Amino acid sequence: MHFLAAAFLLLTLSASALAEPVHFRDCGSGVGVIKEVNVNPCPTQPCQLHKGQSYSVNVTFTSNTQSKGSKAVVHGIVMGVPIPFPIPDPDGCKSGINCPIQKDQTYSYLNKLPVKAEYPSIKLVVEWKLQDDNDQCLFCWQIPVQIES
């Protein structure tokens, strides 16, 4: 089991190394600083997300606080309305971050963004937050996307 987890992590790291950084809008990283956001594959923006596919997300950030844990909260914003966008594992400590999170340390957060087949073909904004134990944002970023068949 540990071998599979290590192989998955290595594959994710390899894929993210090939990814181009995306232009993002910081939406309130109150207790952290985003260094870089990568979504793979996303060669152009807005990112073209295809139904039934999964996209790797890698966020490099520096924490300005300590926290025992972290949780991701993802929304799709359609016409100004945030709609929950479930991800497989919202626990940041299982997404490449060694917890507890230390102040002034830089981390690489790794996760997947699954695009379900039943999602409508639509333009929207993905908002991705990673919150500390006090629900303050270690990072918050937004990017425009287009969901396609």
Curated annotation (Swiss-Prot):
Tissue: Found in the fluid from the distal caput to cauda epididymis, not detected in the rete testis and the proximal and middle caput epididymal fluids (at protein level).
The protein's name: NPC intracellular cholesterol transporter 2
Secretion signal, residue range per the UniProt entry: 1-19
Keywords noted in UniProt: Acetylation, Cholesterol metabolism, Disulfide bond, Endoplasmic reticulum, Glycoprotein, Lipid metabolism, Lipid transport, Lysosome, Secreted, Signal, Steroid metabolism, Sterol metabolism, Transport
Quaternary organization: Interacts with NPC1 (via the second lumenal domain) in a cholestrol-dependent manner. Interacts with NUS1/NgBR, the interaction stabilizes NCP2 and regulates cholesterol trafficking. Interacts with DHDDS. Interacts with NEDD4L (via C2 domain). Interacts with NPC1L1.
Species for this entry: Sus scrofa
Disulfide bridge positions per record: 27-140, 42-47, 93-99
Family of the protein in this entry: Belongs to the NPC2 family.
Record-level GO cellular component terms: endoplasmic reticulum; extracellular space; lysosome
Keyword Ribonucleoprotein appears in the UniProt entry: no
Post-translational modification: N-glycosylated. Found in the epididymal fluid as a 19 kDa glycoprotein that is processed during its passage through the epididymis into a 16 kDa protein.
Protein's gene: NPC2
GO terms under biological process: cholesterol efflux; cholesterol metabolic process; cholesterol transport; intracellular cholesterol transport
SUPFAM superfamilies: E set domains
Gene3D superfamilies recorded: 2.60.40.770
Modification N6-acetyllysine, positions: 116
